[in-house]
């Protein structure tokens, strides 16, 4: 296995362990066990657990951004985007669990690197939503505000679904889609 492949294996193992145990409860030994390697080898690739955390976040962010690279507001509709985000909760709830773990760590790291990471995650999320919305809403300030609202809705609805399997996320997203489409229609007529 190449050095790059081994590094990726460790990042994938760390992602799984951090999601299951939380960053603070996870150890290098846990990550090494998940990756089926010795703990000493983890330190060959990563200086410490925090460096591994940052590498996991970078990998998660890159994977997410690749989904939307090249999409403009005209190439993907709001219902398609909302459907993809809703189904992510069902298909990959660990993606959101990871997100909440990073949020929790960042909130406690006032002025530190993790707080900046959370700010970057949220900013990237807003931008990835605002850019295509600007094609539909016309007013860039409104597109950015709508992106912030949608991001809060996505995270909040996902949290409700993860902690309560009976939560009707389908109905909530149906209504959210109708609200977004109505807002776009109204803003288009201005």
Give the role of each language-model region:
Residues 9, 13-51, 55:
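Helix-turn-helix
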Residues 24-25, 137-144:
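Short, charged helix-capping/linker segments at alpha-helix termini
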Residues 83-90, 99-109, 179, 183:
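Helix-loop "lid/cap" segments that line or gate small-molecule binding pockets
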């Amino acid at each position: 296995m190449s050095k790059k492949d081994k590094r990726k294996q460790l990042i994938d193992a760390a992602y799984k362990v951090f999601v299951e145990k939380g960053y603070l409860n996870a150890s290098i030994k846990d990550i090494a066990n998940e990756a089926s390697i010795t703990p000493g080898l983890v330190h060959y690739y990563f200086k410490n657990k925090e460096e591994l955390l940052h590498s996991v976040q970078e990998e998660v962010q890159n994977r997410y951004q690749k989904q939307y690279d090249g999409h403009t507001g005209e190439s993907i509709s709001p219902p398609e985007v909302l459907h993809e985000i809703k189904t992510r909760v069902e298909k990959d709830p660990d993606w959101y669990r990871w997100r909440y773990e990073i949020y929790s760590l960042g909130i406690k790291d006032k002025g530190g690197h993790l707080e900046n990471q959370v700010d970057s995650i949220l900013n990237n999320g807003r931008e990835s939503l605002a850019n295509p919305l600007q094609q539909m809403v016309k007013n860039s300030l409104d597109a950015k505000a709508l992106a912030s609202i949608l991001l809060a809705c996505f995270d909040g609805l996902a949290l409700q679904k993860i902690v309560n399997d009976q939560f009707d996320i389908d109905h909530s997203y149906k209504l959210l889609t109708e609200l977004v489409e109505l807002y776009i229609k109204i803003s288009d007529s201005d």
